[in-house]
Curated annotation (Swiss-Prot):
<dbReference type="GO" id="GO:0022857">
    <property type="term" value="F:transmembrane transporter activity"/>
</dbReference>
<keyword id="KW-0472">Membrane</keyword>
<protein>
    <recommendedName>
        <fullName>Transmembrane protein 14 homolog</fullName>
    </recommendedName>
</protein>
<dbReference type="GO" id="GO:0031966">
    <property type="term" value="C:mitochondrial membrane"/>
</dbReference>
<feature type="transmembrane region" description="Helical">
    <location>
        <begin position="3"/>
        <end position="23"/>
    </location>
</feature>
<dbReference type="GO" id="GO:0070453">
    <property type="term" value="P:regulation of heme biosynthetic process"/>
</dbReference>
<comment type="similarity">
    <text>Belongs to the TMEM14 family.</text>
</comment>
<keyword id="KW-0812">Transmembrane</keyword>
<dbReference type="GO" id="GO:0005743">
    <property type="term" value="C:mitochondrial inner membrane"/>
</dbReference>
<dbReference type="InterPro" id="IPR044890">
    <property type="entry name" value="TMEM14_sf"/>
</dbReference>
<dbReference type="InterPro" id="IPR005349">
    <property type="entry name" value="TMEM14"/>
</dbReference>
<keyword id="KW-1133">Transmembrane helix</keyword>
<dbReference type="Pfam" id="PF03647">
    <property type="entry name" value="Tmemb_14"/>
</dbReference>
Length: 112
């Protein structure tokens, strides 16, 4: 499989958002969450770049971020940062489901 550039950029964007949250507001939870989710997404992009992609980590992390930030966006009504991360996470979900759908199989089946 080719390198999952979208996944790596998505991971870097989430991590950079956490760093920006810390730099602007001194938010240590934002820094921790941004770096943790960025690391998970980066490792997920690495798994997607293997000969047999394994998209579940990136899909699960994207789904969790979309839900978490979507709820935050709904409460605050502010596009930045919650709305932007929610939309980016939904885009990552759609892209990964479209790209890696044949690698999402029930347990006990073999990869193509």
């Amino acid at each position: 499989m080719p390198v999952d550039w979208f996944g790596y950029v998505y991971a870097a964007t989430v991590a950079a958002g956490g760093i920006m949250g810390y730099a602007k507001a001194g938010s240590i939870p934002s820094l921790g969450a941004g770096l943790a989710f960025g690391a998970l997404l980066g490792y997920g992009a690495h798994l997607n770049s293997q000969d047999t992609p394994r998209p579940l980590l990136q899909l699960g992390t994207s789904l969790f971020l979309a839900g978490l930030m979507g709820a935050r966006w709904n409460r605050s009504g502010k596009l930045m940062p919650a709305g932007m991360v929610c939309m980016l996470s939904v885009a990552a979900l759609v892209k990964n489901l479209a790209t890696y759908n044949r690698y999402l199989m029930p347990a006990g089946t073999k990869a193509p």
